[in-house]
């Protein structure tokens, strides 16, 4: 039986992933201050204990949530803050913030990059909100919101430079269906979470072009090698296991699952949609669109050869034909 935790926490964001995180916390009898900026969602939570727009079938125990549109009210008296909005909206979410976050544990569940800033969420919060690295954590791993919201078994990694911070977050989340481990590879798991979205776009493009499973296996193997080479060059540590869930597991589920929004975007591109029309077709943000530009810049800086990520960038930002770009890639994959 789950015991009630002493820490009070906040979740900033009201999409599918934020809703799944709130579900997990409330199942653990953890009270959550929840930043919800949408009036329809606020009303549905208060009246029916459901988020009417995202995971509308997911019941949220009303006794354990305090929804509010006031970010300062939401974070004021909490110990731990979860960031769970698309990366493109993070600065807008935090714009009204006057309360300091420096003495709180701030957990990024974003899996994205700040567009135009080219900083990871951890780097952004450290630089602009003065949250010390010891108070910053990343929560990542193979974790579709739809499955977490259904309480289906998932394995997540909480990474922080400070083991005590990681353990506190782990204790809040851990239960029978949400299993957490800890890591100190903060920048590595955060980079992997960003990169796998780009690679899911590549796989989606191949699916849209009607390449078969044999080729997809080779493509994803190439993605794993490319990611490993990039991590070793840009965030080198001695004990990283690229086959762990935070790296390989997240890559595989994002590339293979029909629930993956990045794969879905890639599939539209592979079927011949323009970038603009494919983005307009998406009902949720595909983080890989923003991440591709960042990975391109980083690979040029580190000198790592990344032909798969480069192919995605060419299609998204250089008006390359998805068919021609993928055909060129097939000639160098092994």
Show which residues each predicted segment covers.
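NAD(P)+-binding Rossmann beta1-loop-alpha1 motif at the extreme N-terminus of oxidoreductases
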Residues: 1-58, 64-69
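Rossmann-like NAD(P)(H) cofactor-binding subdomain of soluble oxidoreductases
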Residues: 62, 67-76, 80-153, 169-171
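Alpha-helix C-terminal capping/helix-to-coil transition sites in glycosyltransferase folds
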Residues: 76-77, 195, 248
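Internal alpha-helical scaffold of NAD(P)-dependent oxidoreductase catalytic cores
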Residues: 89, 100, 127-135, 153-240
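NAD(P)-dependent Rossmann-like dehydrogenase/reductase catalytic/cofactor-binding core
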Residues: 203-207, 232-334
């Amino acid at each position: 039986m789950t015991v009630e935790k002493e820490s009070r926490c906040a979740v900033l964001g009201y999409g599918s992933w934020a809703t799944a995180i709130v579900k997990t916390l409330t199942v653990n009898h953890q009270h959550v201050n929840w930043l919800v900026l949408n009036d329809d969602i606020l009303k549905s939570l208060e009246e029916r204990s459901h988020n009417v727009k995202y995971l509308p079938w997911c019941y949220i125990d009303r006794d354990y949530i305090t929804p509010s549109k006031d970010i300062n009210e939401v974070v004021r008296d909490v110990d731990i803050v979860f960031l769970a909005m698309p990366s493109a909206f993070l600065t807008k979410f935090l714009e009204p913030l006057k309360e300091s976050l420096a003495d709180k544990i701030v957990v990024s569940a974003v899996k994205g990059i700040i567009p135009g800033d080219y900083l990871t969420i951890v780097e952004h919060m450290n630089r602009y909100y003065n949250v010390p690295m010891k108070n910053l954590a990343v929560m990542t791993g193979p974790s579709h919101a739809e499955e977490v919201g259904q309480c289906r078994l998932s394995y997540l990694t909480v990474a922080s430079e400070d083991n005590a911070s990681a353990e506190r977050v782990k204790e809040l989340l851990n239960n029978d269906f949400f299993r957490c481990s800890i890591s100190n590879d903060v920048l590595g798991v955060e980079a992997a979470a960003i990169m796998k979205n780009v690679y899911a776009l590549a796989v989606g493009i191949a699916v849209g072009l009607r390449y078969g499973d044999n080729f997809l296996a080779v493509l994803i193997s190439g993605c794993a090698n490319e990611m490993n080479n990039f991590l070793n060059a840009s965030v080198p540590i001695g004990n990283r296991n690229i086959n762990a869930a935070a790296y390989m597991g997240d890559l595989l589920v994002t590339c293979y699952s029909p629930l993956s929004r990045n794969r879905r975007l890639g599939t539209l591109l592979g079927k011949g949609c323009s970038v603009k029309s494919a983005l307009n077709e998406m009902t949720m943000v595909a983080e890989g669109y923003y991440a591709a530009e960042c990975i391109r810049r980083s690979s040029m800086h580190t000198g790592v050869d990344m032909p798969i990520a480069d192919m995605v960038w060419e299609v998204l930002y250089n008006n390359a034909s998805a068919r021609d770009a993928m055909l060129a890639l097939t000639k160098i994959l092994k």
